[in-house]
């Protein structure tokens, strides 16, 4: 809106200048007409009174035009002052916008620092949870080893009991075969569990690498923030230099070139920052791909855990079947193998407890994995927010640079308009002074001519110091142009003989 007002004022100044030039041309035409009237006055003495009256009338019209030109000049000076005031308001608005932008930028920096602290706290909590999970897995491994030792002892006892019962009970042989099948299935379950633990370790490694990548992204984001603050500081310095350069118009051109070089340097730094942001975005995409891979592996781990649960349920069903068969066998060989069966029942009960404990640990591990996955999703959402904020800061920086360039162009245009208005005002002032001086000279000459004509004095020519011939009427002179000298001389020569007679 201020730019449109300045354009309107510039157009008004141009129109006023054109009107002043037209008034000047009209003044020159009237001056020529006045000279022609004076020539007619010299050619005919009978019409002297009428010509003098017309000369006075032309003089009054000329004085009125001079007064109008003075009024127009004052209006031009008022408009020039209004242009200067608009320029000052533009500078004040520029400073206010810069201060507001600095306050907004500081608030965003504080928000970014707060989010960064929260993110660091969450990462530390996640590391503590991962450490607890590692401890739980270490305990699970120790329990697994103990269970394997107990299982080996149980196998040895079962083999000894089977050797003693092979020759006696066919049903016990079938029980041994079933126990072997049970052991084989237990081994398969143990292998599946080992595979799950290996996959969990691999997930831990990938999670550690992902944490390292997140830390690297945070460092790069911090370096990007430092670069942005440096660019903003240089931009503020540049704005201060632009504001200070308005006070010294004599060194404005050199300062403008230096500022333009500085602007180009800032643009190069901005392009470098953009390339860094692109690299950061590429790394973020790679990290996202790694997270997707980790999610797929977690899904596979869940599937394996589900299979292990199914195997455990099958083992429990087989265990129930074995209990039923043991109860049937107990009725037949209760007197001979009561102690062995009691030991087997105790071992089976212990094995069931261990299976239940393992199921609880597996459920706790799955719960911890889900919680870890949720934490990772939250972290990546925060990283995405940080990247989006960085893009917003970048866009705001570009808008600020564009706004600063626009304000700079408006300032230069206002200075050019002020310079042109000053030049037009000086030119009009010179023309007005010349017209006033010419009017005063003509007024004096007309008054002298009027007085001399009333007294009936002779008319003669003489040459002035400017080289132009002058018409003398008993001491009064009227300066004539070189173009009119010949015609005026001939007219006067024709007029002089009657006077001498």
Swiss-Prot record:
Polar residues: bias regions: 492-501
UniProt xrefs under Pfam families: Myosin_tail_1 (PF01576)
Cellular compartment(s): Cytoplasm, Myofibril
InterPro entries: Myosin_tail
GO CC, any one term: myosin complex
Positions in coiled-coil regions: 1-457
Domain characteristics, as noted in the entry: The rodlike tail sequence is highly repetitive, showing cycles of a 28-residue repeat pattern composed of 4 heptapeptides, characteristic for alpha-helical coiled coils. Limited proteolysis of myosin heavy chain produces 1 light meromyosin (LMM) and 1 heavy meromyosin (HMM). HMM can be further cleaved into 2 globular subfragments (S1) and 1 rod-shaped subfragment (S2).
Function: Muscle contraction.
Name by which UniProt lists this protein: Myosin heavy chain, embryonic smooth muscle isoform
Organism annotation: Oryctolagus cuniculus
Highest classification ranks of the organism: Eukaryota, Metazoa, Chordata, Craniata, Vertebrata
């Amino acid at each position: 809106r201020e730019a449109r007002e300045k354009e309107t004022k510039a157009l008004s100044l141009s129109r006023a200048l054109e009107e002043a030039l037209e008034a000047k041309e009209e003044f020159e035409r009237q001056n020529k007409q006045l000279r022609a009237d004076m020539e007619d006055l010299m050619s005919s003495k009978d019409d002297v009174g009428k010509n003098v009256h017309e000369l006075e009338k032309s003089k009054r019209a000329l004085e009125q035009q001079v007064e109008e030109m003075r009024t127009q000049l004052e209006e031009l000076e008022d408009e020039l002052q209004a242009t200067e005031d608009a320029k000052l308001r533009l500078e004040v608005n520029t400073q206010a916008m810069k201060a507001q932008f600095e306050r907004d930028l500081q608030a965003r920096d504080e928000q970014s620092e707060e989010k960064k602290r929260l993110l660091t706290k969450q990462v530390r909590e996640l590391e503590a949870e991962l450490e607890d999970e590692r401890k739980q897995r270490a305990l699970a491994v120790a329990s697994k080893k103990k269970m394997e030792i107990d299982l080996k002892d149980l196998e040895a006892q079962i083999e000894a009991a089977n050797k003693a019962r092979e020759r006696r009970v066919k049903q016990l042989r079938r029980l041994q075969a079933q126990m072997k099948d049970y052991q084989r299935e237990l081994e398969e379950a143990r292998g599946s569990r080992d595979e799950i633990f290996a996959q969990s370790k691999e997930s831990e490694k990938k999670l550690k690498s992902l944490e390292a990548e997140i830390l690297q992204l945070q460092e790069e984001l911090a370096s990007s923030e430092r670069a942005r603050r440096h660019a903003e500081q240089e931009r503020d310095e540049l704005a201060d230099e632009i504001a200070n350069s308005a006070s010294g118009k004599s060194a404005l051109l050199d300062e403008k070139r230096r500022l333009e070089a500085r602007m180009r340097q800032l643009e190069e730094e901005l392009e470098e920052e953009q390339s860094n942001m692109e690299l950061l975005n590429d790394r973020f995409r790679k990290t996202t791909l790694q997270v997707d891979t980790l999610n797929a592996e977690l899904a596979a781990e869940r599937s394996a855990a589900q299979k292990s649960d199914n195997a455990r349920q099958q083992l429990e069903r087989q265990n129930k079947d074995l209990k039923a068969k043991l109860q049937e066998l107990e009725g037949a060989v209760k007197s001979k193998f009561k102690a062995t069966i009691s030991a087997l029942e105790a071992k089976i009960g212990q094995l069931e407890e261990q299976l239940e404990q393992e199921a609880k640990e597996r459920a706790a591990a799955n719960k911890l994995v889900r919680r870890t996955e949720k934490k990772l999703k939250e972290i990546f959402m925060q990283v995405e927010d940080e990247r989006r904020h960085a893009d917003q800061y970048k866009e705001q920086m570009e808008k600020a640079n564009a706004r600063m360039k626009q304000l700079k162009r408006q300032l230069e245009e206002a200075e050019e308009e002020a310079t042109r208005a000053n030049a037009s005002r000086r030119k009009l002032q010179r023309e007005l002074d010349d017209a006033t001086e010419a009017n005063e000279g003509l007024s004096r000459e007309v008054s002298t001519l009027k007085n001399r004509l009333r007294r009936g004095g002779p008319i003669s020519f003489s040459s002035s110091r400017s080289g132009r011939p002058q018409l003398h009427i008993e001491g009064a002179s009227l300066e004539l142009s070189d173009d009119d000298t010949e015609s005026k001389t001939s007219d006067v020569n024709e007029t002089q003989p009657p006077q001498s007679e």
